[in-house]
Amino acid sequence: MKVFSAVLIILFVCSMIIGINAVRIPVSCKHSGQCLKPCKDAGMRFGKCMNGKCDCTPK
């Protein structure tokens, strides 16, 4: 059980670090599939739609 808790904490910290590096680009969207190409064109690796704008995560 202690190992499981430690793994959860590590995953939580890693997800926060990745989320901090997200960059919002001025592209409107309705779903995350619309953000893939604009984020790749901006030099980012991943993209998702949040509050109607694309949030991109760097490589």
Curated annotation (Swiss-Prot):
Residues 1-22 form the signal peptide. Transmembrane segments: none annotated. It is found in: Secreted. Pfam families: Toxin_2. Disulfide bonds join C29-C49, C35-C54, C39-C56. One of its GO terms (molecular function) is ion channel inhibitor activity. One of its GO terms (cellular component) is extracellular region. Has also been shown to inhibit with high potency Kv1.3/KCNA3 and with low potency Kv1.1/KCNA1 and Kv1.2/KCNA2 voltage-gated potassium channels. Also binds and inhibits the molluscan calcium-activated potassium channels KCa (Kd=135 nM). Has the structural arrangement of an alpha-helix connected to antiparallel beta-sheets by disulfide bonds (CS-alpha/beta). Belongs to the short scorpion toxin superfamily. Potassium channel inhibitor family. Alpha-KTx 03 subfamily. This is Potassium channel toxin alpha-KTx 3.5. It comes from Androctonus australis (Sahara scorpion). The lineage of its organism: Eukaryota, Metazoa, Ecdysozoa, Arthropoda, Chelicerata. The gene is KTX2.
